[in-house]
Amino acid sequence: MKIRHFQLATLAAAIAFSGIAAADITVYNGQHKEAAKAVTEAFTKETGIKVTLNSAKSEQLAGQLKEEGDKTPADVFYSEQTAPFAMLSEAGLLEPLSADTIKQTQHKGVPVAPKKDWIALSGRSRVVVYDKNKLSEKDMEKSVLDYATPKWKDKIGYVPTSGAFLEQVIAITKLKGEQVALNWLKGLKENGKLYAKNSVALQAVENGEVPAALINNYYWYALAKEKGEDKLNSRLYFIRHQDPGALVTYSGAAVLKGSKNKEEAKKFVDFLASKKGQEALVAVRAEYPLRTDVVSPFNMEPYAKLEAPEVSATTAQDKENANKLIEQAGLK
């Protein structure tokens, strides 16, 4: 009889243990791999939940998620931009997040998901990087629109395949109108130098191939940390005064409605918004933490001084229209 009781107790303990064992999760990752690796490793260390990262461009992953629908193997979508969330939210593929999770990164200027089904996590600023040996700050324009003019013929680099570039087109369209955005794109094609990546455009400025380029801030800060700011040939210019050239773009995350591991997925997104999660991210990447109690170790321009326009993609149509304009201008 004692043996029987022992067996039942052992079985009950095994069932109880299996019931609390956390499932592993799969993250479709459009964020930079270095940043994603840092936060997932910190999350696993904190919770014991293992994370599989499937990485590609955010827009590509969003398209894949729409095709997969509720049958997706993904639990979380971690995007470098917020624009892809609009399409997925409208398709009903995202799970609402708790108010406690969302409020961790909410403050003035940070985009809010209309259905509370994704969260902004970190920001990066659009900037002009320029060759300090050829240009000075007084040569810089007060609006990003003015870099697409004949004055800058062969003097300005740009990266039309960048997700942040797409969001800048959305910002120009919303703030200045569709025709202005199209004229800007055509002007860049006519007068600018096209590069495949932001890092390549930055290196072109460093090497003296082009005097200036439109990029994201963190590429320059990473290079400055690696080589030393005094060793660089380039400097950053911040356009400010709510111009679309001062745009801050945001990374974010969402739990997929088709996730088979929603509890663990929500824990992961909550961790990304937590102090530990934000600290893990900004330790390796010069992005702005959205928690006010986390400070970046990079010597970045203060977030409060960026004077960014409060504009972002809120519908799938915003993204679709921007892509059409880029294509119409002959840049796709």
Give residue ranges: language-model regions:
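Periplasmic-binding protein-like
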Residues: R124, W152-V159, L185-L188, G192-Y195, K231-K257, F271-V294
